[in-house]
């Protein structure tokens, strides 16, 4: 980002949060006149002043960090898929598409957008709910319509004696509190004190360590712990991901960084139980983080165990910031994936055929479409797009 645009983007963030020029100046230890001049004259901002302003923003921001569920996989010990869909998820089963394929050994999938329910003829497999990132966001739209929270949904699941197979807790850094490249550097300098014995790092979409299957970020990505274990952390520069996907300028991204706590099996069970029991996201998330990792600053003459916490890390885990809250970001189901596929794989050929029809006076494309029979799957997807959330949910437990 160009030096002179930094204050423009910073001003936009300040105004979005609702912080006055005077409050920002006072918190940063600047005169109001000097700060106002920086903004109004779009002046170049020295690096030291930038740091003071950034630190002040963290302290003044009402929610510098938020917590989201970014992956939920739950196994229900039952073969009654209708009960799970209608009584637990509280969705109307008639709107779900059934597909004769599955994953993880399941043979059939009921789907509404990215919300997936998998079944198997084997009793020991039960019914599996799979919510990835977009699935979580879409399911939150249904929870909102039902006037339910994640806590209430999980309590309902627990009554079914479920097994939480995987849960990802995403701590979103909205203000650039974490410096991921610096944390990677600290890992290499042994300034990361952790129960885990391994870390892996990537930069600019390229490999720094060794090949990882789900590293698709332009910015820095850090894995702490083994991906084969039931608990590991993934830290990455989310703003770069949004730049690649949506073209969003780095400083304008809603989320700057993300710290993901990825939990499986008993670890996932324990985390959800703690969340539901206490409804204290700060305690649950940072209880896990603090138990397994901390970043320190090396001091000569002292043992590694005595090195002080790094100030940036100290702020992240709770000092000089407001308490972490569980939030939602509900999104409607869209045809984005289908439209992208159509745009890249079908549209060029379709356009060519339409032009040939136009120039040759034929109607091959129209004839093909007129004679195409929609399957039940396609009719249900049309219904999903035509119905409101309230039309597709069950408002009360049966």
Could you describe each region identified by the protein language model?
Residues 10, 24-25, 35-38, 335:
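Conserved hydrophobic/aromatic packing and binding residues within compact polymer-binding modules
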Residues 29-45:
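Recognition helix of helix-turn-helix/homeodomain-like DNA-binding domains
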Residues 46-62:
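DNA major-groove recognition helix of helix-turn-helix/homeodomain DNA-binding modules
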């Amino acid at each position: 980002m160009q030096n002179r645009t930094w204050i423009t983007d910073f001003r936009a963030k300040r105004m979005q949060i609702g912080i006055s020029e005077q409050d920002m100046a006072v918190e940063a230890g600047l005169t109001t006149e000097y700060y106002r001049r920086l903004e109004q004259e779009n002046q170049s901002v020295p690096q030291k002043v930038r740091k003071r302003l950034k630190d002040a923003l963290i302290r003044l921001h009402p929610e510098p960090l938020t917590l989201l569920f970014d992956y939920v996989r739950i196994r229900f010990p039952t073969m009654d898929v209708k009960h799970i869909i209608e009584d637990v998820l509280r969705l109307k089963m008639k709107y779900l598409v059934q597909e004769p394929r599955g994953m993880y050994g399941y043979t059939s999938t009921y789907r509404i957008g990215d919300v997936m329910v998998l079944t198997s003829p084997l009793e020991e497999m039960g019914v599996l709910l799979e919510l990835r990132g977009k699935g979580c966001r879409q399911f939150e739209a249904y929870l909102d319509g039902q006037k339910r929270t994640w806590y209430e949904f999980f309590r309902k699941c627990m009554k079914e004696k479920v097994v939480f197979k995987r849960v990802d807790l995403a701590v979103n850094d909205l203000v650039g509190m974490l410096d991921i490249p610096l944390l990677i550097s600290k890992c290499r300098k042994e300034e990361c004190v952790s129960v885990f014995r391994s870390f892996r790092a990537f930069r600019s979409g390229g490999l720094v360590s060794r090949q990882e299957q789900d590293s698709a970020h332009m910015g820095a990505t850090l894995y702490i712990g083994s991906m084969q274990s039931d608990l590991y952390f993934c830290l990455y520069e989310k703003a770069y991901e949004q730049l690649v996907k949506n073209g969003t300028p780095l400083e304008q991204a809603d989320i700057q960084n993300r710290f993901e706590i990825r939990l499986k099996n008993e670890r996932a069970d324990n985390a959800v139980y703690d969340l539901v029991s206490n409804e204290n996201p700060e305690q649950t998330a940072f209880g896990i983080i603090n138990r397994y990792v901390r970043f320190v600053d090396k001091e000569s003459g002292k043992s590694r165990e005595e090195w002080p916490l790094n100030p940036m890390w100290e702020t992240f885990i709770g000092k000089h910031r407001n308490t972490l809250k569980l939030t939602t970001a509900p999104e409607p189901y869209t045809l984005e994936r289908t439209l992208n596929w159509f745009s890249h794989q079908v549209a060029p050929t379709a356009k060519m055929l339409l032009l040939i029809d136009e120039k040759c006076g034929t109607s091959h494309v129209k004839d093909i479409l007129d004679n195409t029979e929609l399957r039940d799957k396609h009719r249900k997807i049309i219904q999903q797009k035509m119905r409101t959330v309230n039309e597709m949910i069950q408002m009360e437990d049966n």
